[in-house]
Design a protein with these regions (language model features):
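Intrinsically disordered, low-complexity Ser/Thr/Pro/Gly-rich regulatory segments
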Residues: 1-65, 70-242
Length: 242
């Protein structure tokens, strides 16, 4: 078996698993996020956690409810969980967020963009760290990626027309149609739109997500002191050192 046949088999498995989950009565309709969460958990490395919920910062701001959050599983100290399974995740810990809908169209793109911007507008800290015994300065904050996921979609020409306006959206996947990737410059201005064929939708999305997450590396270390200052009235953690 050659590598192409191997990866095509991987695509068939991913597509089949995702279709089964989405067609299940529990997830059918507008609330398909659990199917996509299981999809991501099925192939992303263990350094990533995937959940639904809210994202908050040290200033007391909270995002809108997010269908799928990909966040750091190793260095995320403040994750709270509701009885319904929704997580509250620190803004510094987030790699990517997604909105899940049955169909992608102009209204859904606008809605997803609004949700994504409720996350990317949050305040994030960055702190010095010790690496290999040496002090390293605070890392530059990495972008928080945003996307939309669905079963079906309007045509790619319509997508291209609107993602120029909705700058929070970096990519999307409609499993019955295509995967798309929006290329932007440092100012989030539209450069081009890359799309997959229908036959390669899932595998293209698989490679795209892995590549984009790899390029981010590891999120910056959050400054826990900022959260302490915001929540403690008497006890204060001293600044200084790392």
């Amino acid at each position: 078996m050659d590598i192409k046949s191997l990866m095509n088999t991987k695509q068939d498995i991913l597509r089949s698993n995702l279709q089964i989950l989405i067609d299940h009565p529990v997830t059918k309709g507008d609330q398909c996020e659990s199917a996509w969460i299981e999809f991501f958990r099925g192939f992303l490395p263990n350094k990533y956690a995937i959940d639904k919920g809210f994202i908050f910062d040290s200033k007391g701001n909270i995002s809108e409810q997010i269908d799928i959050i990909i966040y750091d599983a190793l260095y995320t100290p403040l994750v709270f969980c509701t009885n319904s399974g929704e997580k509250f995740v620190t803004a510094e810990s987030v790699y990517a967020v997604f909105e899940s809908k049955p169909t992608i169209d102009k209204t859904k793109l606008e809605y997803a963009d609004k949700k994504i911007k409720s996350v990317t507008s949050l305040y994030r800290t960055s702190r010095e760290m010790i690496s290999s015994g040496k002090r390293v300065g605070p890392r530059k904050l990495t972008p928080i990626l945003g996307g939309i996921l669905s079963v079906d979609s309007v045509g790619i020409d319509t997508i291209s027309k609107h993602v120029n306006r909705y700058k929070g959206i970096d990519f999307g996947c409609a499993i019955n149609n295509f995967t798309f990737h929006v290329r932007r410059n440092e100012n989030r201005e539209f450069l081009s739109l890359i799309t997959s064929s229908k036959d390669e939708t899932i595998l293209s999305f698989f490679y795209l997500i892995l590549d984009e997450l790899y390029k981010l590396g590891t999120v910056a270390g959050l400054d826990i002191r900022e959260y302490a200052y915001a929540t403690l009235e008497q006890f204060k953690i001293e600044r200084g050192g790392v």
